[in-house]
């Protein structure tokens, strides 16, 4: 029988054993992480979901198991979805006799029944009446503890019975507890959250003592499965912490979010288990309709690397082929596989976007450890028992909440030293849970406890094994660092770690933002780190040939790098022609307007060719527009980048390219001839001058700007396009000022010319302005 939480698994096993009048571990047993009570007589085992996954990976036949019960399945944790998918695979291929039962009080059963083709069994159960009291405003997320404390006080004074209050996290619980102690001295306060020891968790859910009124301040750990006797009042903040995976950064972080309606129903139900009760909701009845009906399956926005490793260990190389209830996002699956390949847990795949990769021997060892693959990599890669023992301590510290808090110095070695000192003195206190986890890991690795002094750089080296993309190098002396994945982080200069040149970052939050103008708001915040010697880290030597947008040239360097961090750089003299060409062409695609000399001659050629293409689409003339040329630079530019055995690599050299000649040569010879015939660049006028024709795509007609006097003797409007397109004549004065526009030169000579002649003769009296144009010589002829 699967339960989503350890506390619920223990309590349910204890309750069933109590009904049978037996101790836990006989007929009824349980197995949770690092703890089990089972025997050869055990018939019913209550497990957490990760334990079942491990059982399926180790033995897909599930020998000795006849039925699997998935309890509280509405929570849709990633482990429950994975366990169900693996169990269905086992049922379909190996164990058709294996029975699967899914149980929930609030889930939409019709969808699951349809997907699994399973019958539905419904039980109304027993629920006492519960009065629901809504707030007159939604809770202020920045005043959660204060508003919860006020409502708890109100409920304590106006109602009878014990109180179960739901808060989003441990921080709010501790603050609310502090507020309540001063105003409700007669109440007994019990916190209840995942990081508490099992003993303290049992105290919180135990029945009240005679004459005692209990207030339990809980996270969603108490939302399902648990029955706390005496509770008839629930105070619900309507908030919870959700672990959100950021695929961009590869980091997961907690966000405080609104709960869904089914979660609110589960919480409310805690008040009606024993007798009638009351539920206080710190939101309005109107806003309740805006809450989502069901929570999203965790598999849709979680880090999938542990899941993918388990699937590979199960023997399936293509996770998407499993019979999922909700298919995990392909993008997150690819990211998970890429991470596992970088940790050498999966064999590399040549296609970066393919969903495949077999488990390696190292990956199989990692999959046997009940922790994230990164942590497992660190523990199995340690090269000595002392180093492995240190890795176990680091793993335990990373898995539990930091006993020193996030606002303290980020020195990881300091925490490890405190842990070892407390272990030596047998006075662990708040470090006890961490010490227990480290001990369990040492048992798995079969090594002894080590409390010797710690080498800080060894700590950094181990962290770098788990988080190779979080190796960080100082970019200045004010706490700014750049990580090997390219992201930037900031450490307060007062932090002891800020003085190091190289760090390995164990815990950070790239979502940290600030309204400060210092620029620190764009960087991540570091919680745990250790110094590291970069000389002991694997580095790669590679050629970095790229476009330098500042120098406006191809940068050619041989670099020694750790990810995005450049340790050493030397110039390269001879890079391959193909590589340089590709880089320049890509730069041209992005910023080619500033890289070449797009002068007036180039623009005139483009307009002339485009004009003919518009007149004659049947000619299929290539597109010589600037936009198209830059997009297709790889097709034409490489032929002109080499001269005398040397590549042109800078904008200075590229601007010397004769674009007119290059663009003209893109056209086949027969098209060149046809364009020259249909759209000549110049036309000869009676004066003997060759006047340039101005082609403007989209204009009324090509324009011929010419002095009026040079047209004496021209009886009709000149044309292009084999006589089909008359030119628009822009007739100019001797001072090159426009005096007339016309496409009908013959009509102009017969009419308008005489009016224009009067004005020109007045302004330019020394010039020759004949009356009989057809017989009059041109100005040049007259001078002769």
Predicted region positions:
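Long C-terminal appendages of very large multidomain proteins
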Residues: 727-773
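Conserved small/polar residues in nucleotide/adenosyl-binding loops
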Residues: 774-783
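Amphipathic alpha-helical packing elements
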Residues: 489-491, 675-704
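P-loop NTPase motor module signature
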Residues: 1-378, 490, 698, 709
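Catalytic or ion-translocation cores adjacent to nucleophile or general acid/base/metal-coordination motifs
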Residues: 238, 258-261, 716, 723-727
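Short, surface-exposed, low-complexity cationic segments
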Residues: 496-513, 697-722
């Amino acid at each position: 029988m699967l339960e989503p939480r350890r506390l619920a698994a223990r309590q349910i096993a204890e309750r069933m054993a109590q009904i049978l009048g037996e101790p836990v571990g006989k007929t009824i047993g349980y197995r949770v992480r690092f703890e089990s009570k089972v025997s050869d007589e055990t018939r019913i085992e209550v497990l957490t979901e990760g334990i079942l996954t491990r059982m399926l990976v180790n033995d897909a036949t599930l020998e000795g198991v006849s039925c699997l019960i998935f309890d509280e399945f509405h929570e849709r944790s990633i482990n429950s979805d994975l366990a169900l998918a693996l169990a269905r695979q086992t049922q379909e291929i190996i164990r058709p006799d294996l029975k699967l039962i899914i149980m929930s009080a609030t889930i939409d059963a019709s969808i699951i029944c349809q997907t699994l083709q399973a019958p539905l069994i419904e039980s109304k159960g027993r629920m006492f009446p519960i009065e629901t009291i809504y707030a007159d405003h939604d809770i202020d997320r920045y005043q959660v503890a204060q508003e919860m404390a006020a409502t708890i006080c109100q409920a304590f004074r106006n109602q009878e019975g014990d109180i179960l209050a739901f808060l989003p996290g441990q921080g709010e619980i501790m603050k609310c507890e502090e507020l309540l102690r001063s105003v409700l001295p007669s109440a007994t306060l019990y916190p209840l959250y995942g990081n508490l020891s099992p003993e303290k968790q049992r105290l919180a859910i135990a029945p009240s003592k005679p004459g005692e009124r209990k207030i339990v301040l809980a996270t969603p750990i108490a939302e399902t499965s648990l029955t706390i006797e005496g509770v008839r009042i629930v105070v619900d903040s309507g908030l919870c912490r959700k672990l959100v995976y950021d695929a961009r950064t590869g980091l997961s972080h907690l966000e405080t979010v609104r709960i869904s309606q089914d979660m609110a129903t589960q919480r409310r139900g805690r008040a009606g288990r024993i007798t009638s009760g009351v539920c206080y909701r710190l939101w309005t009845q109107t806003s309740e309709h805006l809450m989502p009906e069901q929570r999203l399956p965790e598999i849709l926005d979680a880090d999938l690397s542990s899941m993918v490793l388990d699937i590979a260990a199960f023997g399936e190389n293509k996770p998407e082929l499993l019979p999922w209830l909700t298919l995990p996002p392909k993008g997150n699956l690819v990211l998970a596989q890429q991470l596992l390949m970088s940790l050498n847990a999966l064999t590399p795949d040549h296609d970066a976007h393919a969903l495949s990769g077999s488990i390696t021997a190292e990956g199989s060892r990692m999959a046997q450890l009940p922790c994230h693959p990164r942590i497992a990599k660190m523990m199995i890669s340690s090269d000595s028992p002392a180093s492995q023992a240190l890795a176990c301590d680091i793993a335990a510290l990373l898995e539990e909440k930091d006993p020193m808090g996030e606002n303290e110095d980020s020195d990881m070695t300091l925490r490890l030293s405190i842990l070892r000192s407390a272990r030596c003195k047998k006075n662990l206190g708040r470090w006890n849970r961490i010490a227990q986890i480290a001990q369990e890991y040492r048992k798995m690795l079969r090594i002894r406890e080590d409390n010797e002094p710690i080498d800080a750089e060894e700590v950094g080296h181990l962290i770098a094994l788990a988080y190779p993309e979080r190796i960080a190098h100082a970019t200045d002396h004010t706490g700014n660092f750049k990580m090997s994945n390219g992201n930037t982080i900031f450490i307060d200069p007062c932090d002891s770690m800020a003085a190091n040149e190289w760090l390995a970052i164990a815990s950070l939050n790239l979502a940290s933002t600030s309204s400060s103008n210092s620029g620190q708001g764009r960087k991540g915040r570091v919680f745990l780190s250790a110094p590291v010697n970069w000389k002991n880290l694997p580095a790669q030597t590679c050629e970095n040939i790229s476009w330098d947008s500042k120098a406006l040239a191809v940068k050619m360097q041989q670099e020694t790098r750790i990810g995005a961090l450049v340790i050493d750089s030397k110039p390269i003299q001879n890079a391959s022609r193909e590589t340089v060409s590709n880089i320049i062409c890509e730069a041209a695609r992005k910023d080619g307007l500033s890289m070449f000399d797009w002068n007036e001659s180039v623009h005139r050629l483009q307009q002339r060719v485009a004009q003919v293409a518009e007149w004659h689409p049947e000619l299929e003339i290539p597109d010589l527009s600037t936009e198209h040329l830059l997009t297709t630079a790889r097709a034409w530019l490489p032929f002109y980048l080499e001269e005398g055995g040397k590549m042109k690599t800078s904008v200075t050299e590229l601007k010397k390219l004769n674009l007119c000649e290059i663009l003209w040569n893109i056209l086949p010879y027969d098209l060149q001839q046809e364009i020259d015939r249909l759209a000549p660049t110049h036309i000869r006028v009676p004066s003997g001058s060759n006047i340039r024709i101005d082609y403007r795509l989209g204009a009324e007609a090509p324009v011929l700007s010419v002095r009026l006097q040079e047209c004496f003797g021209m009886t009709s409007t000149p044309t292009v396009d084999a006589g089909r397109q008359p030119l628009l004549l822009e007739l100019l004065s001797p001072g090159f000022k426009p005096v007339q526009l016309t496409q009908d030169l013959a009509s102009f000579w017969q009419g308008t010319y005489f009016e224009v002649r009067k004005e020109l003769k007045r302004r330019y009296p020394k010039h020759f302005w004949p009356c009989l144009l057809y017989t009059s010589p041109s100005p040049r002829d007259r001078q002769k």
